Amino acid sequence: MITTKTVNGVQIAFDDQGHEPGPVFVTLSGWAHDLRAYDGMLPYLRAAQRTVRVCWRGHGPDRNLVGDFGIDEMAADTIGLLDALEVDSFVPIAHAHGGWAALEIADRLGAQRVPAVMILDLIMTPAPREFVAALHGIQDPERWKEGRDGLVQSWLAGTTNQAVLDHVRYDSGGHGFDMWARAGRVIDEAYRTWGSPMRRMEALAEPCAIRHVFSHPKIGEYDALHDDFAARHPWFSYRRLGGETHFPGIELPQQVAAEAIDLLAGARI
């Protein structure tokens, strides 16, 4: 059952499952998605550790407008919710640009409380020109739907995976121009501020174990970027999967859950 708590004056929707001791898995979606993005992974995660799935403000069952917010508020809301739930240490599992908030959370709390972070398919380079154009497009009230639809098609990459198609068709609605425009602005600001997620990781006051799990883009240069970063930073690792889409947690839930469990095991050593 999805429940809510009032945190920082807004309703934050979540569910809380599993009772295994130790660090809690905390799932965080990308923009304009909610906790259902982790339905496939949930049985594997909660069997290993207590698992709290969090919806960003305005992303729960109540889709009324909530006013402006960004990464600072996303991080503060998540920390406030976990404090209210008496969660001590935890491992964020964040999809796509939810990863910016996960890194902010890790930076604020330190490695003792956040021993690891797993990010699913976030663009690790500086934002490509065509992606920046798409971010600007979804901020234009005259063409935001066209921009949104173009992004979705790029995420799907022609897949026939039914779980991914069902998620996009049935579980990701309810957001209009207000939320999509905000997503474009906040993501654009993150890349302009930090340059890339890897540079954001390097700025952490106390680095924790971080793993990036993804299936695309399927180009050797992207793997080389990850190899170079991992060679310079022993706390970083990555796993390329054989999926087709931007949604590895939906497309390959058992494999992605296994990566989270392995990451946590390594962080405990």
Swiss-Prot record:
Keyword Aminoacyl-tRNA synthetase found: no
Induction line: Up-regulated by PQS.
InterPro entries named in the record: AB_hydrolase_1, AB_hydrolase_fold
GO molecular function: dioxygenase activity
Active-site residues, Swiss-Prot/TrEMBL: H246
Reaction(s) this enzyme catalyzes, per UniProt: 2-heptyl-3-hydroxy-4(1H)-quinolone + O2 = N-octanoylanthranilate + CO + H(+)
Site (Increases basicity of active site His): D121
Domain of life: Bacteria
EC number: 1.13.11.-
SUPFAM superfamilies xrefs: alpha/beta-Hydrolases
Keyword Oxidoreductase (UniProt): yes
Keyword terms: Dioxygenase, Oxidoreductase
Binding site for substrate: H97
Subunit and partners: Monomer.
Known role: Ring-cleaving dioxygenase involved in the degradation pathway of the Pseudomonas aeruginosa quorum sensing signal molecules HHQ (2-heptyl-4-quinolone) and PQS (2-heptyl-3-hydroxy-4(1H)-quinolone) to anthranilate. Catalyzes the cleavage of PQS to form N-octanoylanthranilate and carbon monoxide. Thus, leads to the inactivation of PQS that plays a central role in the regulation of virulence factor production by P.aeruginosa, thereby quenching the production of antimicrobials, which may contribute to the competitiveness of M.abscessus in presence of P.aeruginosa.
The family this protein is said to belong to: Belongs to the AB hydrolase superfamily.
Full protein name: 2-heptyl-3-hydroxy-4(1H)-quinolone dioxygenase
Organism, as annotated: Mycobacteroides abscessus (strain ATCC 19977 / DSM 44196 / CCUG 20993 / CIP 104536 / JCM 13569 / NCTC 13031 / TMC 1543 / L948) (Mycobacterium abscessus)
Gene designation: aqdC
